[in-house]
Amino acid sequence: MLKFLNKKKNDNKGFSLVELIIVVAILAILVGLLAPQYLKYVEKSRKSADASNLDEMVRAIQVYAADAEETLPEDTYTITINKDDKSGKATTVVTVNSKKDANKEVAERALTEAAPDWAKTKLKSNKWDSGETGENKANATYISAEITVAQDGGTTVKYTPASLATYINKTAKTGK
């Protein structure tokens, strides 16, 4: 009788169906728990990329304004990064709050020196809070930085939407 119990099956070559179902169920539970966290990390990285792209463009303008060899006229410059439009056109725009087109050209030259492909930068995140509440609450379709250049080369930056300013974790004010 003991010999019968000591005999091993030689045809046991794999897992049983029950074992496979249990493993699949455990994997499904893990995916269900981890997927929302993964999506949060992906969105956070998209926002980080957007904030970094805009911040680098702002720094290019600030450095150009503070540089004694270059001349960035006293003015207010706005850099806006929009969502990718369906036509595939450039989505980053520099505007100047004056009637002098020369100021815009100088700002664009400053950006081109720092980042040659700045005009092709696209908004990666679709979840920037527009700051609106109630029925008008929606996600912002752009992020922007308004850079005011003083006569001495000092700069003040205002970020839009407000959630971008807290994401970059600063309200930049630098001087010469």
Segments (PLM) and residue ranges:
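N-terminal single-pass transmembrane signal-anchor helix
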Residues: 12-38
